[in-house]
Every structure is written in structure tokens, then in C-alpha cells.
Amino acid sequence: MPKLQGFEFWSRTLRGARHVVAPMVDQSELAWRLLSRRHGAQLCYTPMLHAQVFVRDANYRKENLYCEVCPEDRPLIVQFCANDPEVFVQAALLAQDYCDAIDLNLGCPQMIAKRGHYGAFLQDEWDLLQRMILLAHEKLSVPVTCKIRVFPEIDKTVRYAQMLEKAGCQLLTVHGRTKEQKGPLSGAASWEHIKAVRKAVAIPVFANGNIQCLQDVERCLRDTGVQGVMSAEGNLHNPALFEGRSPAVWELAEEYLDIVREHPCPLSYVRAHLFKLWHHTLQVHQELREELAKVKTLEGIAAVSQELKLRCQEEISRQEGAKPTGDLPFHWICQPYIRPGPREGSKEKAGARSKRALEEEEGGTEVLSKNKQKKQLRNPHKTFDPSLKPKYAKCDQCGNPKGNRCVFSLCRGCCKKRASKETADCPGHGLLFKTKLEKSLAWKEAQPELQEPQPAAPGTPGGFSEVMGSALA
């Protein structure tokens, strides 16, 4: 069967998918993809896989792809990060039988991508990207796609997209933020950039960014003219986003845990998903956050989920008919998380610094930060009052705390240098240079003297050759 391209690939292989779950490291595993598909997702991506590791490590291939596929999980696109055309194609050839397309990650803005020289940090190396896409387009039996971030300039972003299309990219996902927009500096994604790309290329385009609810999806499709909309963080906080529903947080948690029992994944993935899904509820029930962080088994997590459900249902029964106050709805329903801006973040950090200063000045559990109060619950015998902590005198030579029982009144490092130089002992630091030297000398004196070999007497056989000569004679 000939390889489908462009709009034919999107309409037939991807079945005209409009609702797309993004590739998310340690978060878009099989169990989560299946949950998302049950609630309106029409296309999913695997987590980003490292092409070089995928080529050399059979266990990595098995754990991250070969054992992570099933018939219900289609259509599926496998995403790789890579910076070498040959390695990218080798990895893609090993993966192409398990998916419907191969995606090249050109959008990751994280520091690990900068150190590894991949993701959004390749967006200025157009010659390299052309070679990677062209070779993959020639060698693979499935289409190659790309996920990119925009440049600040719309015209440069358009030329970038056209270059990838010309090289052989069959579908483009455009995240409407630059690589500098991340974390507290994320800001809003530019749909204007996405719209300009869509008008300039003749392949399908997916939009990514600013998607928190179904109304955002519909507005993005209308305003940009793209073929589909991809959600990442919005999907993590509400997997039913594409259905336009906001179900109770425990409902989706229970459904997800049932899928995990059938399709196991690392417990760290499960815990991370529930922290996102329950984000607003855990602000109210902090002790359940502690429990979720501590449990070591899937059944332990299920028990925390059941406890959360009971508490929320009890709260609902007490507030029968009540309406939510403020802009946020009830905490027990799935809802977006609005990331605080840089100003809000700096205020929070300033508040944390002032709290620590207050603790240092006054001490006592009544003024401890929430984090230290949690630590005190875990370590009840540990003191957090600065006034009760032991005070250490400083070493005269380096300023580090000196040993209380050091014979030289120095820290261990300085004491070791001095004791070695003077062949002295410091029992306080366990340094016994003098004692060890004395024991060594005493041992040598106690050994019998080595006997010098005596010359043979005249007329007696002298050595091996002489004795053998006599015997032969």
C-alpha cells in the first residue's frame, strides 16, 4: 500500500482527528491514553522517546513502546527527540510497525533539551532539520510529522514551517509559544502565529497552547482554521475536556486506576497523574497529599482515592444546593489549573523568605512553614527551633565548625593535615598517626633478623650445578 501524505494521511489514517492528546514525558503512557480516548480524544502521541537510547537499548524499546501498544490505542503517533539523521531514521524504522506516523520533537524548551541539543534548540539549524526530515521521508513506510515552537517573528515562523513541509513533513503541530516561554514565563500562546502557518502550508496543522476547555477547542478551530487541536496540561487536569464535561475528580481517578490494573505502568506515573487531577482538592485536604506521596502500592493509592471520595461526598451533602463562590467552581470537579504569572510567583517567593526569617527570629511550631510542619509530623523527635540547636565554634584556619573534642581545636580537615605533619594523634577525630607509627616500628623490631646466606666450606658441594655435575660423573 503506498504511503499516504498530507491531507489524505490526516483524513484516512488519522480519521480526520480534531481532538489530540499531546506527547508528555512520563504522562502520556498507554493507560492515560486509553482513559483520554474514552473521553473524546481521537488521536494520541506517545511520550517523547530518545532516539539514540531507543536504537541501542532493547529493554528501553520494550518498556516504552513494544509493551505499550494495544488495538484500542490507534491512531497513534510515536515521538522521538534526535539530532542525527541516521540515528533518527534507525529509531523510526524500529518503531514504524507499532504506530501510524513518526513525529520529530522540535518543541521541547526544557534545559535537558538544551544540554542534549534537541527539541526547540534545533530550530535555528535548518540544514540539519532538512536532512533529518528528508531522510526519514525517504526511508520510512509511515509519514513523518513535526511538533514545533514559534519564533517571535511571524514571517520567520512561516518560513520555518514551509522549510519543514518542503523537506517531507506531512503534518505540523504548532505550539504558539517561543522556546523562552516556559514555566512562570509561559504567558499566552499566539494563535496569530498558528493561523499564519496554517494559511502558508499545504499540509494539515494542529494547534497547541491555551486549551483548557472544550470552548477553547472550538474557538481555536474557528479562529485559526487548523485541522485539529492538541491539549497537554488541560488534558492532565481534565481528561474529559474534549467531551465538554467536568466530572468529579474521584470518578476519573477510579477509572484510571482500573485501566492501570489492566495495563500497568510505574507508580510514579500514577501518582503524578493524581496530583494533577486532584490539584484543587488537595489544596483543601493537605493530609491526603501527604498520604498520596507516601503510599508504595497501587492498592494504597486506591485507598487514598476512596478516602478523598468519601470526604468530598460528605462535603457535598453538607453544602446541598450551595453555589460556588468566586471565579473557581467546586474543588471536587475537574477544572483547569491557571499557572501563576511571574509577578505572583515572585510575591510567593518573597513571602516564603519572610516566613523563614520569622522562624529564625522566633522559633516554635506555631510559626513554622507548612513544609516544616509536615517534616515535623514525619520526624517528631527532630527540633526545628533554632534556639535549641547546638552552636558550633569555628575553626581558626578555615571557618568550618571545629571539633568539640579536637586536641588542636580545628575542624577535621585542618586537624588531619596538622596531625599528619606532626605525626600526632587526635582521638576526637579518630586520627592516630603517632600510634600507628609506633605500632609499625614495634612490629619490625619484634621480627627475627633475616639470615645472610653463608658461603660454602672448602671441599663441600657448592651449588646445584656442582652437585648435578658430581652426580653425572
UniProtKB/Swiss-Prot annotation:
Positions annotated to bind FMN: P23, M24, V25, Q79, K147, H175, N208, G209, N210, A232, E233
UniProt subcellular location: Cytoplasm; Nucleus
GO terms of molecular function: flavin adenine dinucleotide binding; tRNA dihydrouridine synthase activity; tRNA-dihydrouridine16 synthase activity; tRNA-dihydrouridine17 synthase activity
Active site: C108 (proton donor)
EC number: 1.3.1.88
Signal peptide: none
An annotated GO BP: tRNA dihydrouridine synthesis
Listed result of changing C108A: Abolishes cell growth
Basic and acidic residues composition bias: residue spans: 341-351
Biased composition (Basic residues): 371-381
Gene3D superfamilies xrefs: Aldolase class I
GO-annotated cellular components: cytoplasm; nucleus
Catalytic activity: 5,6-dihydrouridine(16) in tRNA + NADP(+) = uridine(16) in tRNA + NADPH + H(+); 5,6-dihydrouridine(16) in tRNA + NAD(+) = uridine(16) in tRNA + NADH + H(+); 5,6-dihydrouridine(17) in tRNA + NAD(+) = uridine(17) in tRNA + NADH + H(+); 5,6-dihydrouridine(17) in tRNA + NADP(+) = uridine(17) in tRNA + NADPH + H(+)
Region entry Disordered, spans: 339-386, 444-473
InterPro entries documented for this protein: Aldolase_TIM (IPR013785), DUS-like_FMN-bd (IPR035587), tRNA_hU_synthase_CS (IPR018517)
Cofactor section: FMN
Pfam family of the protein (one): Dus
Main location: cytoplasm
Keywords: Cytoplasm, Flavoprotein, FMN, NAD, NADP, Nucleus, Oxidoreductase, tRNA processing
The protein's role, per its UniProt record: Catalyzes the synthesis of dihydrouridine, a modified base found in the D-loop of most tRNAs. Specifically modifies U16 and U17 in cytoplasmic tRNAs. Affects the level of some mature tRNA and thereby the total cellular translation.
Protein family: Belongs to the Dus family. Dus1 subfamily.
Stated name of the protein: tRNA-dihydrouridine(16/17) synthase [NAD(P)(+)]-like
